[in-house]
C-alpha cells in the first residue's frame, strides 16, 4: 500500500497514556511476532533508528519525556511520522519505546502501532472494526469532552497497540504499562542523550493542549 506523502509531526502523536484498555484475546501469530522482532532488532541502536526516520518528539509535549504512572512505565517514544497512515504492518511500527536503566542507558523494550481513526474509517467505512495485529485489536483513544471532537491532546482520535517485543511485561505483552521498568534513570539518560535534554519523568495526564502540525515531506 502506498504511504501518504504527508506526515504528522511528533506533536501530533499521542499515546493511550491515560488508562489501560482491554484488547482482543485471539492468540498472537508467532510468525508476525517473529517478523516484528526481526524488523526492529537493529533499532536497539538509537542512531540506526534515527537514520531510519524515527525521532523523539520536541521538548514541551508529553511524549518528549519518559512516560510513567502508577500502573507502570512506557518510556521514551521515538516516532516515525512517515509511517502514520492506514497501513498496518508488523514490520513497520510507528513508534519505538525505549526505557532507561539506572545508568541512563536506553534499551528498546516495545514497539507501538498507531492508526488515526478518521483515515481508517474513510478507507474501511464508518464504524469499521479497529485495526488489529498479532490477534489483538488496537485500542481507540476517543474524543474528549470540550475538545471539539479531538482527543484530550487536541488531535484527532486514533487507535494504538503497544507490543513488548524486547522486554517482558508482567501485565501482558500488549499492555501499555510495564511495571517491571521505570523512569528512575531518566535524568541520567538526559545527560547521555542530547535528544532528551533536561526532562522530568511524569504521567502523561489529561492536561495541556497541543496543536496538530501537518506538513509535506518536502516542506
Q: What residue spans do the PLM features occupy?
A:
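Signal peptide processing junction and immediate N-terminal pro/mature segment
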Residues: 22-28
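Bacterial N-terminal signal peptides
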Residues: 10-21
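Intrinsically disordered, low-complexity sequence elements enriched in Ser/Thr/Gly/Pro
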Residues: 1-3, 16, 35, 40
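Primary mode marks residue(s) on the alpha4-beta5-alpha5 output face of response regulator receiver
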Residues: 28-219
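Bacterial N-terminal signal peptides that target proteins for export
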Residues: 1-11
Amino acid at each position: 500500500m502506498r504511504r501518504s506523502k504527508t506526515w504528522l509531526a511528533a506533536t501530533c502523536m499521542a499515546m493511550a497514556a491515560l488508562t489501560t484498555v482491554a484488547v482482543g484475546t485471539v492468540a498472537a501469530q508467532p510468525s508476525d511476532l517473529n517478523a516484528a522482532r526481526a524488523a526492529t532488532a537493529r533499532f536497539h541502536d538509537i542512531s540506526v533508528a534515527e537514520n531510519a526516520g524515527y525521532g523523539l518528539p520536541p521538548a514541551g509535549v508529553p511524549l518528549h519525556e519518559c512516560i510513567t504512572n502508577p500502573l507502570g512505565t512506557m518510556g521514551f517514544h521515538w516516532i516515525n511520522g512517515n509511517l502514520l497512515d492506514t497501513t498496518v504492518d508488523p514490520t513497520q511500527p510507528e513508534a519505538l519505546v525505549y526505557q532507561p536503566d539506572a545508568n541512563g542507558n536506553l534499551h528498546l523494550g516495545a514497539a507501538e502501532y498507531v492508526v488515526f481513526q478518521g483515515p481508517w474509517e474513510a478507507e474501511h467505512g464508518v464504524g469499521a472494526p479497529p485495526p488489529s495485529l498479532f490477534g489483538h485489536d488496537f485500542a481507540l483513544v476517543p474524543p474528549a469532552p470540550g475538545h471539539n471532537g479531538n482527543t484530550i491532546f487536541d488531535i484527532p482520535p486514533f487507535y494504538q497497540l503497544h507490543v513488548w517485543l524486547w522486554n517482558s511485561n508482567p501485565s501482558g505483552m500488549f499492555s501499555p504499562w510495564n511495571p517491571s521498568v521505570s523512569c528512575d534513570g531518566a535524568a541520567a539518560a538526559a545527560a547521555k542523550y542530547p535528544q532528551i535534554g533536561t526532562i522530568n519523568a511524569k504521567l502523561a495526564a489529561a492536561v495541556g493542549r497541543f496543536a496538530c502540525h501537518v506538513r509535506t515531506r518536502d516542506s
